[in-house]
Amino acid sequence: MTNIRKSHPLIKIINHSFIDLPTPSNISAWWNFGSLLGACLGIQILTGLFLAMHYTSDTMTAFSSVTHICRDVNYGWLIRYMHANGASMFFICLFLHVGRGMYYGSYMFIETWNIGIILLFTVMATAFMGYVLSWGQMSFWGATVITNLLSAIPYIGTTLVEWIWGGFSVDKATLTRFFGFHFILPFIIAALVMVHLLFLHETGSNNPSGLNSDTDKIPFHPYFTIKDILGLLLLIFLLMTLVLFSPDLLGDPDNYTPANPLSTPPHIKPEWYFLFAYAILRSIPNKLGGVLALVFSILILAILPVLQFSKQRSMMFRPLSQCLFWILTADLFTLTWIGGQPVEHPFIIIGQLASILYFSIILFFLPTFSLLENKLLKW
């Protein structure tokens, strides 16, 4: 009799994706982040669902409903802080996952990579709208500032902003629609994840060497299921440490003040995971230029396959490119720091230099050094 795992129409899909999937034997812990992102998405959907049972998307009661969740709902504080800090964990895993893809040349799987970029944009949109829902000062002013950026689009900008707001300012209509979008987007993300995996399984996984590994594949289960479970336990440990010991570490104190359209906070800034893009936005004095730089700071990932001039896929054996990659990483940390600083000297010039360096490394230095490495290896 045939094994049900291999014959049942539904179970065999799961079997080919997570059990009998041929996997390169040498993939390192950097390949754990895909499964961790799946776990993060699951945690966010579950905690979000329970929060939505008690939350009210009305300007008069939104802030109070969040307070009610934390004070009166059974384990409400735990659910709320797991959701808020779960978003931070989600982005840490996302950045590491993208960084892994850049380092080991995984962007050469073009369809998988492009779906990944769409996923990154969707997750960022979801997180932004979720931040608005608690209706604190930073939520309100963050929503006002970020949605206002669309007014930089020539001709249709102002109309577009008012259409998104559902009025002439961020108000009840905005909050209600943001709640609607914030609820539906994670399910769209889950669907995109399936497409992402579908394209990945067409080609098979990349590996640290960047070489073809068809001759040395092992089944995903039990080897990588156990490895992923270890990663998951570490993720949960880190998340719960953050939630139970310092849940407000990554939040903004201003968000404990109810939204007030008549009082602007001295420094408007988004959550930490958007600070690098916010720093790039602020580094350009022109509004439209800033918005374009903001979009291209992430969209630039899409042209990485075009800029691959090296004869080796991975950076594993390319010390010059490795050096550049870590300079780029340090530059992103610098941008994140600058994004949280006030707009004054010397932060303005540091932000501008860091932004120039970010685009220069990706567009100029990485391709140039790749060609140089080819020459040095006499290829």
Curated annotation (Swiss-Prot):
GO biological process: mitochondrial electron transport, ubiquinol to cytochrome c
Highest taxon of source: Eukaryota
Record bears the keyword tRNA processing: no
Cofactor: heme b
Pfam family, one: Cytochrom_B_C
Residues that coordinate or bind heme b b562: 83, 182
Cofactor-binding details, from the entry: Binds 2 heme b groups non-covalently.
Coiled-coil boundaries: none
Keywords: Electron transport, Heme, Iron, Membrane, Metal-binding, Mitochondrion, Mitochondrion inner membrane, Respiratory chain, Transmembrane, Transmembrane helix, Transport, Ubiquinone
Positions with a binding annotation for heme b b566: 97, 196
Subcellular location: Mitochondrion inner membrane
Gene3D superfamilies with a match to the protein in the record: Cytochrome Bc1 Complex, Chain C (1.20.810.10)
Main location: mitochondrion
Cellular component annotations (GO), alphabetically ordered: mitochondrial inner membrane; respiratory chain complex III
Single GO MF annotation: ubiquinol-cytochrome-c reductase activity
Chain ranges passing through the membrane: 33-53, 77-98, 113-133, 178-198, 226-246, 288-308, 320-340, 347-367
CDD domains: cytochrome_b_C (cd00290), Cytochrome_b_N (cd00284)
Entry binding sites for a ubiquinone: 201
UniProt topology in membrane: Multi-pass membrane protein
InterPro entries, per the entry: Cyt_b/b6_C, Cyt_b/b6_C_sf, Cyt_b/b6_N, Cytb/b6-like_sf, Cytochrome_b, Cytochrome_b_C_euk/bac, Cytochrome_b_N_euk/bac, Di-haem_cyt_TM
Function: Component of the ubiquinol-cytochrome c reductase complex (complex III or cytochrome b-c1 complex) that is part of the mitochondrial respiratory chain. The b-c1 complex mediates electron transfer from ubiquinol to cytochrome c. Contributes to the generation of a proton gradient across the mitochondrial membrane that is then used for ATP synthesis.
Oligomeric and partner information: The cytochrome bc1 complex contains 11 subunits: 3 respiratory subunits (MT-CYB, CYC1 and UQCRFS1), 2 core proteins (UQCRC1 and UQCRC2) and 6 low-molecular weight proteins (UQCRH/QCR6, UQCRB/QCR7, UQCRQ/QCR8, UQCR10/QCR9, UQCR11/QCR10 and a cleavage product of UQCRFS1). This cytochrome bc1 complex then forms a dimer.
Note: Heme 1 (or BL or b562) is low-potential and absorbs at about 562 nm, and heme 2 (or BH or b566) is high-potential and absorbs at about 566 nm.
Recorded family membership: Belongs to the cytochrome b family.
Name this protein carries in UniProt: Cytochrome b
Native organism: Glis glis
